[in-house]
Amino acid sequence: MMTMKEIMSQKTFAVLGNTLDETKYAYKIKQGLLEHGYTVYAVGKELNSLNEIEEEIDIIDLCIHPVKGIKLLKECEKNFKCIVIQPGAESEEIIQYLQENNIPYIEGCLLIGLREYAENN
């Protein structure tokens, strides 16, 4: 399992959630990552699937309703290093799926990770 510090040392993030609504955390996380020089892909409102991303993904950030999140994760054919589950995006089904498939994850907030560990890449 990666620590938040290790996660923030990665380069490419996929944010799952409503990244077009300025009032939503997914939007704030996407903007924060971009401002710190990370490569960011937005899935949910901008892209429909993680599989649409041609580049390799380091981190997937779940900032989306758990029902939509589990669907996107199950459809994902891409390799990645870790998933960050934002508060409110977790469910027993997601945790069980990740554990059964040996997918590394942490529960946490990338906004806090940005504040504590991000350096301009």
Residue ranges of model-derived segments:
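Alpha-helix C-terminal capping/helix-to-coil transition sites in glycosyltransferase folds
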Residues: 9-10, 55-59, 79
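Hydrophobic, well-ordered beta-alpha structural blocks that scaffold small-molecule cofactor pockets
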Residues: 1-44, 51
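Redox-cofactor binding/interface segments in oxidoreductases and associated redox assembly factors
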Residues: 15, 61-62, 85
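Active-site capping/gating segments
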Residues: 104-121
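Glycine-rich, highly charged phosphate/nucleotide-binding loops
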Residues: 42-73
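Short, acidic/turn-prone active-site loops that include or flank metal/cofactor-
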Residues: 45-46, 66, 86-91, 109-113
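ADP-ribose/adenylate-binding Rossmann-like module
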Residues: 79-98
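Short phosphate-binding/catalytic loops that engage adenosine nucleotides
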Residues: 38, 81, 103
